[in-house]
Amino acid sequence: MSDSQCDALVFFGATGDLAYKKIFPSLQAMIKRGTLNVPIIGVAKSGWNLDRLQERARDSLEHHGGVDTAAFARIKELLRYIDGGYEDIETFNNLKKTLGEASRPAHYLAIPPTLFATVVEHLAAAGCAPSGARVIVEKPFGRDLASARALNRILLKNFTEERIVRIDHYLGKSPVHSMLFFRVSNSLHEPVWSREHIESIQLTMAEDFGVQGRGAFYDTAGTIRDVIQNHLFQVLSNLAMEPPARTDSESIRDEKVKVLKSIRALGPDDVVRGQFRGYREENGVARDSQVETFAAVRLWVDSWRWQGVPIYIRSGKLLPVTCTEMVARLRRPPSILYENAQPNYLRFRISPAAEIAIGLNVLDSQETGVGQTTELIASRHAGANERDAYERVLSDALAGDRTLFAREDYVEEAWRVVDPVLGAATALHTYERGSWGPAPSAAVTPPGGWIDPIVNGESR
């Protein structure tokens, strides 16, 4: 086992929803691949014992992909359980005993951020945070710039930055982290990937469903906090970053941070927020809620490559389709011969199926001198054999590969950009279910308009 590989996995919140839906299925997948062979220690305050946690693990697997008999048998061999409160130091003393000689444990905090400080401090006090230990935390990394800085101070008090793993499972999606490879490995593409040739970039993350019973959580977040500040900024970083000088994790993360440092902080004229009609009647939602379920934003990246190129992001719930994609619209060709020639574009779809397509002009065979836009599909796959995003990020976290994870400076720069427009800093507009957001969002529209995603033959 290498010095970067952890020698024990501890996950707090072992009886919770995240463990049930994501962690146990990821553990089984890792065991099947041969990438996990260390003690797995669950910690929670539920009055459970090991047998009941094992039953919970089996039930999780039955409802999320199925039980692999051999892999589940191995999970049972590796699994331990400590029942106790996070405020009780005795819980952590028991954890220390259970860890035994482990010197590089990974502590996964699958718990609310309000408990992070207590758990991290007790880990250190009980001797569970030796120099080789690491701590894994889930997004959200704070609620704004001030809380993100406070959270980082808590973590850095007992762990060095190299030992802090900030997980955003979205980066585990293969199409997201393959964007840079596509950019720099294709000589047809990279030379035009700059302000000289790109007119604008648009990112869409649309969902055709609502809050799905998560109203109480969603009403504390909203679209900007929930997906734009993290998921979509990560996509943007991969699109806009410079090719790193080396392929090590720090070189790649350095370039991503440079992108965020180049983005102007958002102002009121750069954002339109919306809320779908009926949101305030959802369970757990305040009847006077000012939380957005839709947002459209315009960004400017003041780097040499992207100076003057507007970048548009929109995301929301109960929109016409469920789809996440990027479209880069190239500058319009000179109108010398054919006045109706439209700008070319590159479309990079992340979900529901990964797809790369190019929009080109061709001459209409039915009308002389008239062109039409056609789309060439360069790559398409449904990702049936693709590793689950949680499995990917958890595997990398345990192996010590930090490439996909947000660094302290990245997190704080992302919050800096959105901080001025959080909460009720801008007006909230109502929109109808199945629409592309409120009418005022037309004020934040790319040149030439949005290219709406087409899924299953319709964009509605």
Which residue stretches match the model-derived regions?
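Secretory/organelle targeting and membrane-embedding segments
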Residues: 1-136, 141-460
